[in-house]
Amino acid sequence: MKSAVFLDRDGVINRALTRDGRPYPPSCLAEFEILPGVAEACAKLKQAGYLLVVATNQPDVGRGTMKQEMVEAIHADLCRRLPIDRVEVCYHPGREASECDCRKPKPGMLLRAARALSIDLARSFMVGDRWRDIDCGHAAGVTTILIDYGYAESLRNMPHHRVSSLAEAANLILDLAAE
């Protein structure tokens, strides 16, 4: 079985648009900007043998305020630019989330990818910037790493580790693997 690093998209891989202290996803390709150091961090993790899986909630599609084709275009661009092995997406808005198993903080996206790619969750990581990512990682049984931007929201579960960027998270993962 393989080890993986599960990555939230907005705020971890690409710049999240921030309004009133809260992050929002880009609504078009022109707004999709990969953060500095992300390409190098992903390359480092791939070279060390990790699978890279994006797990992202995109409820604006379910709400009808964004087209699924635009999300797919953003993911196609993402996969052209970074060595991503799989992208898992939940389109369910909050009201429908109680009926799905995939919207973070539920672990469905991670569990689905783990089955498809033969991932050992006990040797894997979830890197995110919000409480939903951390709770999802805990529910899936992976080590959680919070990229702490100081958003105006409280954590429900404490992350195993806190960092300031994906580059720092990648270095931490490689250090932990060497122990």
Label every PLM stretch briefly.
Residues 3, 69-86, 95-126, 130-179:
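Asp-based, Mg2+/Mn2+-dependent phosphohydrolase catalytic module
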Residues 7-9, 56, 128-129:
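Active-site flanking residues adjacent to catalytic metal/cofactor-binding acidic residues
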Residues 15-17, 91, 148:
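Residue-level signal for short segments within beta-strands and strand-turn junctions
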Residues 32, 65, 124-125:
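Residue-level marker of alpha-helix boundaries and capping positions
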Residues 38-71, 75, 84-93, 137:
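Substrate-recognition element of Asp-dependent hydrolases with the DxDx(T/V) motif
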